[in-house]
Amino acid sequence: MNKKVKFEDLGLIDYKKCWDYQEDLFSGILKVKSKNRKENTINPTNNYLLFCEHPHVYTLGKSGDEKNLLVNEEYLKSRGATFHKINRGGDITYHGPGQIVGYPILDLENFFTDIHKYLRFLEESVILTLSDYGLSAERSKGETGVWFDVGTPNARKICALGVKNSRWVSMHGFAFNVNSDLSYFGNIVPCGIIDKKVTSLKKELGQEMDITEVKNKLKTHLVRLFEIEII
């Protein structure tokens, strides 16, 4: 099993450009696995972890409802935002500057073949990062992501998850609000959940955050949880 993971911080990158890059990496892993099956070989598969930020964009998962986008295309243009229907799970979400978007493109057969464990590890990496800043976050039963004050009227989400998995190869991932402009979430019903709010690390701590520092903490927790070697 190859537990080496190539890490790339892509910085601020167009959503479609990054999506195409993910698809190329994802397809490359699947091709190796297909060849191994057909030829009864054991060629190692690569693993990748991408961090990035996106210009303002809304994405709708394959099980989502377009009615959860509350504004029209003209309004999106006026706010410098775009909209994409994509092939991950989940409903609608927002990406923008100040948000850490993580795309683990992993052959889970190098780690473990349990999609629920995979999602819980992604959530746990964010929960542990928030703990580093003195914040106590949690999961919400029946919902993915990372939350504060679950079960109260002030329940609010700081990290959303949406992944695709095929033959144990993952793509897409998580969106962690650090210095995000939360007003953009007002244009959607985030993740299709009507009665919940969203928040950011900046809002919780009342100050602009060093996003590079947050990325480093997050990466450290991912490395430990998945027992990976960054290359």
Question: What spans do the regions from the language model cover?
Answer:
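Long, positively charged amphipathic alpha-helical accessory segments at protein N-termini or as interdomain linkers
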Residues: N2-L10, N110-I158, V163-I231
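N-terminal lobe of the biotin/lipoate ligase/transferase fold
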Residues: M1-A155, M209
